[in-house]
Amino acid sequence: MGASLKKIEKSVATLELTIPKEKFEEGLDYAFKKNASKFNVPGFRKGKAPRFLVERYYGEGVLYEDAIEYVFHEAYQEALKTFNLEPVDYPDINILQIGKGKDLVLEATVAVMPEVELGEYKGIEIEKIEYDVYDGDVEYELEKLRQQNARIIPVEGRPAEQGDIAVIDFEGYIDDKPFEGGKGENYELELGSNTFVPGFEDQIISHNVGETFDVTVTFPEDYRVEELKGKTAVFKVTLKALNKKELPELDDEFAKDVSEFETLEELKQDIRKKLEEKNKREAENEMKEKAVMKVVENAKVDIPDVMVERQIDLSLRDLDYNLRLQGLDLNTYLSITGKTIQDLRKEMWEGALNRVKTQLVIDKIAKVENIEATEEELENKLKELAESYRVNLEEFKKSLTESQINGIKEDIAYYKTIDFIFNQCKIVSKEE
Protein backbone atom coordinates (compact mmCIF):
# COMPACT_ATOMS: atom_id res chain seq x y z
CA MET A 1 0.00 0.00 0.00
CA GLY A 2 1.23 3.47 -0.88
CA ALA A 3 0.57 6.89 0.55
CA SER A 4 1.53 10.47 -0.18
CA LEU A 5 1.03 13.64 1.82
CA LYS A 6 -0.46 16.08 -0.67
CA LYS A 7 -0.54 19.11 1.64
CA ILE A 8 -0.96 20.41 5.17
CA GLU A 9 -2.74 23.73 5.35
CA LYS A 10 -3.92 25.34 8.59
CA SER A 11 -3.42 22.02 10.40
CA VAL A 12 -5.58 20.10 7.92
CA ALA A 13 -3.73 17.28 6.15
CA THR A 14 -4.69 15.76 2.80
CA LEU A 15 -3.43 12.22 2.22
CA GLU A 16 -3.62 10.15 -0.94
CA LEU A 17 -3.87 6.43 -0.22
CA THR A 18 -3.33 3.75 -2.85
CA ILE A 19 -4.65 0.30 -1.99
CA PRO A 20 -3.42 -2.45 -4.38
CA LYS A 21 -6.11 -4.12 -6.46
CA GLU A 22 -5.42 -7.45 -4.71
CA LYS A 23 -6.17 -5.91 -1.32
CA PHE A 24 -9.27 -4.20 -2.68
CA GLU A 25 -10.43 -7.53 -4.11
CA GLU A 26 -10.04 -8.99 -0.62
CA GLY A 27 -12.24 -6.17 0.65
CA LEU A 28 -14.89 -6.84 -2.00
CA ASP A 29 -14.95 -10.50 -1.05
CA TYR A 30 -15.34 -9.54 2.64
CA ALA A 31 -18.19 -7.17 1.76
CA PHE A 32 -19.98 -9.88 -0.22
CA LYS A 33 -19.74 -12.45 2.58
CA LYS A 34 -20.90 -9.88 5.12
CA ASN A 35 -24.00 -8.95 3.11
CA ALA A 36 -24.76 -12.17 1.17
CA SER A 37 -27.92 -12.93 3.13
CA LYS A 38 -29.45 -9.59 2.08
CA PHE A 39 -29.24 -10.16 -1.69
CA ASN A 40 -32.28 -11.48 -3.53
CA VAL A 41 -31.42 -12.46 -7.13
CA PRO A 42 -34.11 -14.05 -9.37
CA GLY A 43 -33.55 -17.79 -9.82
CA PHE A 44 -31.78 -18.17 -6.49
CA ARG A 45 -32.94 -18.50 -2.92
CA LYS A 46 -32.27 -15.32 -0.95
CA GLY A 47 -28.59 -15.13 0.00
CA LYS A 48 -27.55 -18.01 -2.29
CA ALA A 49 -26.60 -16.16 -5.50
CA PRO A 50 -22.88 -16.09 -6.40
CA ARG A 51 -21.00 -12.81 -6.13
CA PHE A 52 -20.60 -12.15 -9.88
CA LEU A 53 -24.38 -12.41 -10.36
CA VAL A 54 -25.06 -10.17 -7.34
CA GLU A 55 -22.70 -7.53 -8.82
CA ARG A 56 -24.35 -7.86 -12.24
CA TYR A 57 -27.88 -7.61 -10.79
CA TYR A 58 -27.32 -4.86 -8.20
CA GLY A 59 -24.38 -3.13 -9.84
CA GLU A 60 -20.70 -3.44 -9.02
CA GLY A 61 -20.89 -0.54 -6.54
CA VAL A 62 -23.16 -2.47 -4.17
CA LEU A 63 -20.08 -3.81 -2.32
CA TYR A 64 -17.92 -0.69 -2.42
CA GLU A 65 -18.88 0.90 0.90
CA ASP A 66 -18.08 -2.12 3.06
CA ALA A 67 -15.01 -2.97 0.96
CA ILE A 68 -13.59 0.53 1.46
CA GLU A 69 -14.30 0.31 5.19
CA TYR A 70 -12.43 -3.01 5.25
CA VAL A 71 -9.23 -1.74 3.58
CA PHE A 72 -9.16 1.91 4.67
CA HIS A 73 -8.20 1.62 8.34
CA GLU A 74 -4.92 -0.21 7.78
CA ALA A 75 -3.84 2.09 4.94
CA TYR A 76 -4.83 5.21 6.87
CA GLN A 77 -2.99 4.19 10.07
CA GLU A 78 0.15 3.37 8.07
CA ALA A 79 0.04 6.81 6.43
CA LEU A 80 -0.40 8.59 9.77
CA LYS A 81 2.62 6.73 11.12
CA THR A 82 4.71 7.39 8.00
CA PHE A 83 4.11 11.15 8.07
CA ASN A 84 4.02 11.44 11.88
CA LEU A 85 0.52 12.90 11.95
CA GLU A 86 -1.78 12.98 14.99
CA PRO A 87 -5.42 13.34 13.91
CA VAL A 88 -7.83 15.30 16.09
CA ASP A 89 -10.97 14.36 14.16
CA TYR A 90 -12.38 11.68 11.88
CA PRO A 91 -11.22 11.92 8.24
CA ASP A 92 -13.36 12.88 5.26
CA ILE A 93 -12.86 10.34 2.48
CA ASN A 94 -13.04 11.08 -1.24
CA ILE A 95 -12.78 8.33 -3.88
CA LEU A 96 -10.28 9.19 -6.64
CA GLN A 97 -10.26 5.80 -8.39
CA ILE A 98 -12.30 2.65 -7.90
CA GLY A 99 -13.26 -0.41 -9.93
CA LYS A 100 -12.73 -4.13 -10.26
CA GLY A 101 -9.20 -4.98 -11.33
CA LYS A 102 -7.92 -1.50 -10.41
CA ASP A 103 -5.98 -0.12 -7.48
CA LEU A 104 -8.27 1.76 -5.10
CA VAL A 105 -7.15 5.38 -4.71
CA LEU A 106 -8.63 7.40 -1.86
CA GLU A 107 -8.10 10.92 -0.60
CA ALA A 108 -8.38 11.41 3.17
CA THR A 109 -8.65 14.92 4.59
CA VAL A 110 -8.27 15.23 8.34
CA ALA A 111 -7.58 17.89 10.97
CA VAL A 112 -4.31 17.09 12.72
CA MET A 113 -2.56 18.21 15.88
CA PRO A 114 -1.06 21.56 14.90
CA GLU A 115 2.61 22.43 14.98
CA VAL A 116 3.41 25.00 17.66
CA GLU A 117 6.06 27.59 16.86
CA LEU A 118 7.21 28.88 20.22
CA GLY A 119 8.19 32.50 20.66
CA GLU A 120 9.97 33.92 23.68
CA TYR A 121 9.04 32.06 26.85
CA LYS A 122 12.10 32.53 29.05
CA GLY A 123 12.85 35.83 30.74
CA ILE A 124 9.39 37.27 30.11
CA GLU A 125 9.04 40.63 31.84
CA ILE A 126 5.99 41.03 34.07
CA GLU A 127 4.97 43.70 36.51
CA LYS A 128 5.11 42.83 40.20
CA ILE A 129 1.73 42.51 41.88
CA GLU A 130 1.36 43.03 45.62
CA TYR A 131 -1.72 43.27 47.82
CA ASP A 132 -1.43 44.92 51.22
CA VAL A 133 -3.43 43.87 54.26
CA TYR A 134 -5.14 46.81 55.97
CA ASP A 135 -6.59 47.08 59.46
CA GLY A 136 -10.03 47.19 57.87
CA ASP A 137 -9.43 43.77 56.29
CA VAL A 138 -8.66 42.29 59.70
CA GLU A 139 -11.72 43.97 61.22
CA TYR A 140 -13.88 42.58 58.41
CA GLU A 141 -12.70 39.02 59.17
CA LEU A 142 -13.32 39.55 62.88
CA GLU A 143 -16.85 40.76 62.14
CA LYS A 144 -17.47 37.63 60.06
CA LEU A 145 -16.38 35.53 63.04
CA ARG A 146 -18.78 37.49 65.25
CA GLN A 147 -21.64 36.90 62.82
CA GLN A 148 -20.84 33.18 62.61
CA ASN A 149 -20.86 32.90 66.41
CA ALA A 150 -23.91 35.04 67.03
CA ARG A 151 -26.77 33.71 69.16
CA ILE A 152 -30.22 33.77 67.60
CA ILE A 153 -32.77 34.99 70.13
CA PRO A 154 -36.51 35.67 69.77
CA VAL A 155 -37.82 39.24 69.54
CA GLU A 156 -40.82 40.07 71.69
CA GLY A 157 -42.95 43.13 72.24
CA ARG A 158 -41.98 45.15 69.18
CA PRO A 159 -42.45 45.20 65.38
CA ALA A 160 -39.85 44.08 62.85
CA GLU A 161 -36.73 46.20 62.42
CA GLN A 162 -33.81 46.32 60.02
CA GLY A 163 -31.39 43.48 60.81
CA ASP A 164 -34.06 41.19 62.29
CA ILE A 165 -34.54 37.65 61.00
CA ALA A 166 -38.16 37.32 59.94
CA VAL A 167 -39.74 33.88 59.63
CA ILE A 168 -42.42 34.18 56.94
CA ASP A 169 -44.89 32.31 54.78
CA PHE A 170 -45.49 33.97 51.43
CA GLU A 171 -47.18 33.46 48.08
CA GLY A 172 -46.88 35.79 45.10
CA TYR A 173 -49.52 36.68 42.52
CA ILE A 174 -49.31 38.43 39.16
CA ASP A 175 -52.69 39.57 37.82
CA ASP A 176 -54.28 37.59 40.69
CA LYS A 177 -52.62 34.35 39.54
CA PRO A 178 -49.89 32.53 41.51
CA PHE A 179 -46.61 32.05 39.65
CA GLU A 180 -43.92 29.39 39.78
CA GLY A 181 -41.23 30.00 42.42
CA GLY A 182 -43.33 32.60 44.22
CA LYS A 183 -44.25 30.53 47.28
CA GLY A 184 -42.41 29.68 50.49
CA GLU A 185 -43.08 28.50 54.04
CA ASN A 186 -41.13 29.15 57.25
CA TYR A 187 -38.59 31.10 55.22
CA GLU A 188 -35.93 32.87 57.29
CA LEU A 189 -35.24 36.28 55.80
CA GLU A 190 -32.72 38.72 57.26
CA LEU A 191 -34.20 42.17 56.78
CA GLY A 192 -31.72 44.39 54.99
CA SER A 193 -29.83 41.52 53.37
CA ASN A 194 -31.31 42.36 49.93
CA THR A 195 -31.96 38.67 49.35
CA PHE A 196 -35.39 39.24 47.82
CA VAL A 197 -36.69 41.55 45.10
CA PRO A 198 -35.94 45.24 45.87
CA GLY A 199 -38.59 46.66 48.21
CA PHE A 200 -39.79 43.31 49.59
CA GLU A 201 -37.83 43.37 52.86
CA ASP A 202 -38.58 47.06 53.55
CA GLN A 203 -42.32 46.33 53.56
CA ILE A 204 -41.97 43.75 56.35
CA ILE A 205 -40.43 46.34 58.68
CA SER A 206 -42.92 47.73 61.25
CA HIS A 207 -45.18 44.65 61.09
CA ASN A 208 -45.78 42.46 64.14
CA VAL A 209 -45.66 38.68 64.55
CA GLY A 210 -48.98 37.09 63.59
CA GLU A 211 -49.91 39.73 61.01
CA THR A 212 -50.80 38.87 57.41
CA PHE A 213 -50.28 41.65 54.90
CA ASP A 214 -49.60 42.45 51.24
CA VAL A 215 -46.17 43.26 49.84
CA THR A 216 -46.16 44.81 46.36
CA VAL A 217 -42.97 44.76 44.30
CA THR A 218 -41.90 45.17 40.69
CA PHE A 219 -39.33 42.74 39.33
CA PRO A 220 -36.29 44.45 37.74
CA GLU A 221 -36.01 44.51 33.94
CA ASP A 222 -32.81 42.46 34.22
CA TYR A 223 -34.35 39.82 36.53
CA ARG A 224 -33.02 36.31 35.90
CA VAL A 225 -36.46 34.80 35.12
CA GLU A 226 -37.63 36.01 31.72
CA GLU A 227 -41.37 35.71 32.50
CA LEU A 228 -41.05 37.98 35.57
CA LYS A 229 -38.97 40.82 34.11
CA GLY A 230 -40.66 44.16 34.76
CA LYS A 231 -43.79 42.52 36.18
CA THR A 232 -45.59 43.80 39.29
CA ALA A 233 -46.40 41.13 41.88
CA VAL A 234 -48.42 41.14 45.09
CA PHE A 235 -47.23 38.78 47.84
CA LYS A 236 -49.49 37.60 50.66
CA VAL A 237 -47.09 37.50 53.62
CA THR A 238 -47.58 36.12 57.13
CA LEU A 239 -44.98 37.10 59.73
CA LYS A 240 -44.76 33.94 61.86
CA ALA A 241 -41.80 34.76 64.10
CA LEU A 242 -39.15 37.37 64.63
CA ASN A 243 -35.59 36.75 65.77
CA LYS A 244 -32.41 38.75 66.03
CA LYS A 245 -28.71 38.09 66.27
CA GLU A 246 -26.95 38.70 69.56
CA LEU A 247 -23.31 39.32 68.69
CA PRO A 248 -20.52 38.39 71.13
CA GLU A 249 -18.20 41.08 72.47
CA LEU A 250 -14.81 41.38 70.77
CA ASP A 251 -12.53 40.59 73.69
CA ASP A 252 -10.08 37.97 74.94
CA GLU A 253 -12.93 35.62 75.90
CA PHE A 254 -14.20 35.75 72.32
CA ALA A 255 -10.71 34.89 71.04
CA LYS A 256 -10.55 31.87 73.38
CA ASP A 257 -13.99 30.67 72.26
CA VAL A 258 -13.34 30.82 68.51
CA SER A 259 -9.63 29.96 68.28
CA GLU A 260 -6.63 28.44 70.00
CA PHE A 261 -5.41 31.89 71.08
CA GLU A 262 -5.59 33.40 74.56
CA THR A 263 -5.98 37.04 73.57
CA LEU A 264 -7.81 39.07 70.95
CA GLU A 265 -4.50 40.61 69.85
CA GLU A 266 -3.05 37.16 69.10
CA LEU A 267 -6.16 36.31 67.08
CA LYS A 268 -5.81 39.55 65.10
CA GLN A 269 -2.16 38.79 64.35
CA ASP A 270 -3.08 35.31 63.12
CA ILE A 271 -5.83 36.71 60.89
CA ARG A 272 -3.39 39.26 59.44
CA LYS A 273 -0.79 36.56 58.77
CA LYS A 274 -3.31 34.35 56.97
CA LEU A 275 -4.57 37.29 54.91
CA GLU A 276 -0.98 38.15 53.93
CA GLU A 277 -0.39 34.53 52.83
CA LYS A 278 -3.65 34.53 50.88
CA ASN A 279 -2.82 37.82 49.18
CA LYS A 280 0.64 36.55 48.28
CA ARG A 281 -0.85 33.43 46.65
CA GLU A 282 -3.41 35.48 44.74
CA ALA A 283 -0.77 37.94 43.54
CA GLU A 284 1.51 35.11 42.42
CA ASN A 285 -1.35 33.40 40.57
CA GLU A 286 -2.18 36.66 38.79
CA MET A 287 1.46 37.11 37.76
CA LYS A 288 1.58 33.51 36.51
CA GLU A 289 -1.56 34.14 34.48
CA LYS A 290 -0.06 37.27 32.91
CA ALA A 291 3.19 35.43 32.14
CA VAL A 292 1.32 32.58 30.44
CA MET A 293 -0.75 35.08 28.44
CA LYS A 294 2.44 36.69 27.11
CA VAL A 295 4.02 33.34 26.26
CA VAL A 296 0.86 32.24 24.42
CA GLU A 297 0.71 35.55 22.53
CA ASN A 298 4.34 35.05 21.45
CA ALA A 299 3.61 31.60 19.98
CA LYS A 300 2.26 30.84 16.52
CA VAL A 301 -0.13 27.98 15.88
CA ASP A 302 -2.88 27.23 13.34
CA ILE A 303 -5.67 25.65 15.35
CA PRO A 304 -8.23 23.58 13.43
CA ASP A 305 -11.82 24.61 14.10
CA VAL A 306 -12.74 21.12 15.26
CA MET A 307 -10.47 21.47 18.31
CA VAL A 308 -12.24 24.69 19.30
CA GLU A 309 -15.65 23.09 18.73
CA ARG A 310 -14.73 20.21 21.02
CA GLN A 311 -13.58 22.63 23.72
CA ILE A 312 -16.94 24.40 23.42
CA ASP A 313 -18.67 21.01 23.78
CA LEU A 314 -16.80 20.48 27.06
CA SER A 315 -17.72 23.99 28.26
CA LEU A 316 -21.39 23.39 27.46
CA ARG A 317 -21.28 20.08 29.32
CA ASP A 318 -19.78 21.82 32.37
CA LEU A 319 -22.38 24.60 32.15
CA ASP A 320 -25.22 22.09 32.00
CA TYR A 321 -23.80 20.19 35.00
CA ASN A 322 -23.50 23.37 37.09
CA LEU A 323 -27.00 24.47 36.10
CA ARG A 324 -28.41 21.10 37.20
CA LEU A 325 -26.82 21.60 40.61
CA GLN A 326 -29.00 24.72 40.84
CA GLY A 327 -32.14 22.88 39.74
CA LEU A 328 -31.96 24.11 36.13
CA ASP A 329 -30.64 22.71 32.86
CA LEU A 330 -29.19 24.08 29.63
CA ASN A 331 -32.54 24.33 27.84
CA THR A 332 -34.07 26.27 30.74
CA TYR A 333 -31.05 28.58 30.82
CA LEU A 334 -31.41 29.28 27.09
CA SER A 335 -35.10 30.00 27.58
CA ILE A 336 -34.40 32.41 30.47
CA THR A 337 -31.65 34.27 28.61
CA GLY A 338 -33.47 34.27 25.28
CA LYS A 339 -30.45 32.75 23.53
CA THR A 340 -30.06 29.85 21.11
CA ILE A 341 -27.40 27.16 21.42
CA GLN A 342 -25.75 28.74 18.36
CA ASP A 343 -25.62 32.11 20.16
CA LEU A 344 -23.97 30.47 23.15
CA ARG A 345 -21.41 28.62 21.01
CA LYS A 346 -20.54 31.87 19.24
CA GLU A 347 -20.04 33.65 22.58
CA MET A 348 -17.80 30.82 23.79
CA TRP A 349 -15.62 30.70 20.66
CA GLU A 350 -12.87 33.19 21.63
CA GLY A 351 -12.50 31.78 25.13
CA ALA A 352 -12.36 28.22 23.81
CA LEU A 353 -9.81 29.18 21.16
CA ASN A 354 -7.59 30.74 23.82
CA ARG A 355 -7.86 27.68 26.11
CA VAL A 356 -6.90 25.34 23.26
CA LYS A 357 -3.94 27.51 22.24
CA THR A 358 -2.78 27.81 25.85
CA GLN A 359 -2.89 24.03 26.30
CA LEU A 360 -0.95 23.44 23.07
CA VAL A 361 1.73 26.02 23.93
CA ILE A 362 2.19 24.73 27.50
CA ASP A 363 2.39 21.14 26.21
CA LYS A 364 5.03 22.18 23.66
CA ILE A 365 7.17 23.91 26.31
CA ALA A 366 6.85 20.86 28.57
CA LYS A 367 8.10 18.68 25.70
CA VAL A 368 11.00 20.99 24.82
CA GLU A 369 12.06 21.33 28.47
CA ASN A 370 11.45 17.64 29.32
CA ILE A 371 8.99 18.54 32.07
CA GLU A 372 7.10 15.49 33.34
CA ALA A 373 5.38 14.29 36.48
CA THR A 374 7.66 12.29 38.75
CA GLU A 375 6.45 9.16 40.52
CA GLU A 376 6.63 11.02 43.84
CA GLU A 377 4.52 13.89 42.48
CA LEU A 378 1.97 11.44 41.10
CA GLU A 379 1.79 9.60 44.42
CA ASN A 380 1.29 12.87 46.33
CA LYS A 381 -1.45 13.96 43.95
CA LEU A 382 -3.23 10.61 44.27
CA LYS A 383 -3.09 10.92 48.07
CA GLU A 384 -4.52 14.44 47.84
CA LEU A 385 -7.36 13.28 45.57
CA ALA A 386 -8.14 10.23 47.71
CA GLU A 387 -8.37 12.44 50.81
CA SER A 388 -10.63 14.93 49.03
CA TYR A 389 -12.97 12.09 48.00
CA ARG A 390 -12.64 10.50 51.46
CA VAL A 391 -11.67 7.09 50.09
CA ASN A 392 -8.87 4.64 50.81
CA LEU A 393 -5.76 5.43 48.73
CA GLU A 394 -5.20 1.90 47.44
CA GLU A 395 -8.87 1.48 46.53
CA PHE A 396 -8.78 4.84 44.77
CA LYS A 397 -5.73 3.78 42.74
CA LYS A 398 -7.44 0.54 41.69
CA SER A 399 -10.50 2.47 40.51
CA LEU A 400 -8.48 4.59 38.07
CA THR A 401 -7.99 3.62 34.44
CA GLU A 402 -4.67 4.04 32.67
CA SER A 403 -6.19 6.96 30.75
CA GLN A 404 -7.23 8.69 33.99
CA ILE A 405 -3.77 8.25 35.52
CA ASN A 406 -2.19 9.68 32.37
CA GLY A 407 -4.58 12.62 32.64
CA ILE A 408 -3.43 13.27 36.22
CA LYS A 409 0.20 13.11 35.08
CA GLU A 410 -0.55 15.60 32.30
CA ASP A 411 -2.18 17.98 34.79
CA ILE A 412 0.88 17.81 37.04
CA ALA A 413 3.21 18.49 34.09
CA TYR A 414 0.96 21.36 32.95
CA TYR A 415 1.20 23.23 36.25
CA LYS A 416 4.91 22.42 36.61
CA THR A 417 5.43 24.05 33.22
CA ILE A 418 3.56 27.17 34.33
CA ASP A 419 5.79 27.30 37.42
CA PHE A 420 8.82 26.89 35.12
CA ILE A 421 7.68 29.85 32.98
CA PHE A 422 7.04 31.98 36.07
CA ASN A 423 10.39 31.13 37.67
CA GLN A 424 12.11 32.25 34.46
CA CYS A 425 10.29 35.61 34.46
CA LYS A 426 11.86 38.97 35.11
CA ILE A 427 9.58 40.61 37.67
CA VAL A 428 9.76 44.40 37.67
CA SER A 429 8.27 46.90 40.10
CA LYS A 430 5.88 49.56 38.86
CA GLU A 431 8.50 52.25 39.54
CA GLU A 432 10.90 50.57 37.10
UniProtKB/Swiss-Prot annotation:
A single Gene Ontology CC term: cytoplasm
Hydrolase among keywords: no
Molecular-function GO term, any one: peptidyl-prolyl cis-trans isomerase activity
Compartment(s) where it occurs, according to its Swiss-Prot or TrEMBL record: Cytoplasm
One Pfam family per UniProt: Trigger_N
Top-level taxon: Bacteria
Protein name: Trigger factor
